[in-house]
């Protein structure tokens, strides 16, 4: 699966800003069929950042969210800034 097909859009809210600052996490809507391994590879390809863990859930609207924790040597704030959301 192509990295641009896996990652759809970042989620920007007060909650996600708090996750970026305090937990070094990013939150994206992702392709519903994407696995956690697909999401890890897409983040590595698109943002050159190593992923520590990926948690996913499917919203009642049927969209899949991925909560992506970056390894300590990478800063989620810098990745968010490169996206223009922080």
UniProtKB/Swiss-Prot annotation:
KW rRNA-binding (keyword) present: yes
Coiled coil (residue ranges): none
Pfam families according to UniProt: Ribosomal_L23
GO biological process: translation
Keyword terms, alphabetized: Ribonucleoprotein, Ribosomal protein, RNA-binding, rRNA-binding
Any GO CC annotation of this UniProt entry: ribosome
Gene3D superfamilies, A to Z: 3.30.70.330
InterPro entries reported in the protein's UniProt record: Nucleotide-bd_a/b_plait_sf, Ribosomal_uL23, Ribosomal_uL23-like, Ribosomal_uL23/eL15/eS24_sf, Ribosomal_uL23_CS
A molecular-function term among this protein's GO annotations: rRNA binding
Keyword Nucleus: no
Top-level taxon of origin: Archaea
Oligomeric and partner information: Part of the 50S ribosomal subunit. Contacts protein L29.
Similarity comment: family membership: Belongs to the universal ribosomal protein uL23 family.
Function description: Binds to 23S rRNA. One of the proteins that surrounds the polypeptide exit tunnel on the outside of the ribosome.
Protein name (database record): Large ribosomal subunit protein uL23
Source species of the chain: Methanococcus vannielii (strain ATCC 35089 / DSM 1224 / JCM 13029 / OCM 148 / SB)
Gene that encodes the chain: rpl23
